[in-house]
C-alpha cells in the first residue's frame, strides 16, 4: 500500500530533480518501468489507446499518431530535450499537470479521456476534468494513469506551434 510519501516512478524526468533538491522525500518508489503493456500504442475500436508509459519520442514517431493526431505528434517531438523526450512519458506529463505541458492542449483538442487504475478498478475521465489547476489532478492516492484514449475520427488537420525562445531545455 502506498503512503502519503510514496511516489510512482515512470520516466522520472520531473520527479528525480524534485528528489535531488529535497522537495520530495519518498519512503517508497513504485517503478512502472517494466510494465510493457503501459508502453503500447494500439487501436481499440473507435479509440486510439496510448499507454501512460509511452515516451514522447515513441509517440512522436508512431505512424498512426502522426497521421491522425498530428498536433500531438508535433508536440511530443518538441518536449524538453532529446533525453527528456526519450525518457519522459505522456502519462507523467499529464500527472505533473504543468501549465507548460506541451501535450496537454493536444489531448484537450482531440477530446481525449484518461484511464485511471485504483483500488476499485479502472475509471475513465474526460481530459478536461482530469486537470483541476496548476499541478493538481483528479488522481487520488493509490491511483495511477494507465492510458490516454483519443477518439478516432476521419483524418483531420491539426498542428502544434510551440511559443518560446528556447529550442531545448
Predicted regions mapped to residue ranges:
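C-terminal structural segment of proteins
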Residues: 1-169
Amino acid at each position: 500500500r502506498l503512503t502519503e510519501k510514496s511516489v510512482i516512478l515512470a520516466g522520472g524526468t520531473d520527479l528525480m530533480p524534485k528528489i535531488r533538491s529535497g522537495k520530495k522525500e519518498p519512503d517508497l518508489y513504485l517503478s512502472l518501468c517494466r510494465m510493457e503493456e503501459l508502453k503500447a500504442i494500439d487501436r481499440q475500436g473507435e479509440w486510439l489507446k496510448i499507454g501512460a508509459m509511452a515516451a514522447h519520442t515513441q509517440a512522436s514517431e508512431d505512424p498512426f499518431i502522426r497521421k491522425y493526431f498530428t498536433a500531438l505528434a508535433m508536440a511530443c517531438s518538441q518536449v524538453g530535450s532529446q533525453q527528456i523526450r526519450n525518457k519522459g512519458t505522456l502519462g507523467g506529463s499529464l500527472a505533473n499537470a504543468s501549465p507548460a505541458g506541451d501535450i496537454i492542449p493536444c489531448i484537450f483538442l482531440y477530446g481525449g479521456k484518461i484511464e485511471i487504475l485504483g483500488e476499485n478498478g479502472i475509471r475513465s475521465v474526460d481530459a478536461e476534468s482530469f486537470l483541476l489547476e496548476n499541478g493538481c489532478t483528479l488522481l487520488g492516492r493509490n491511483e495511477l494513469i494507465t492510458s490516454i484514449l483519443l477518439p478516432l475520427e476521419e483524418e483531420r488537420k491539426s498542428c502544434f506551434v510551440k511559443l518560446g525562445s528556447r529550442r531545448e531545455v
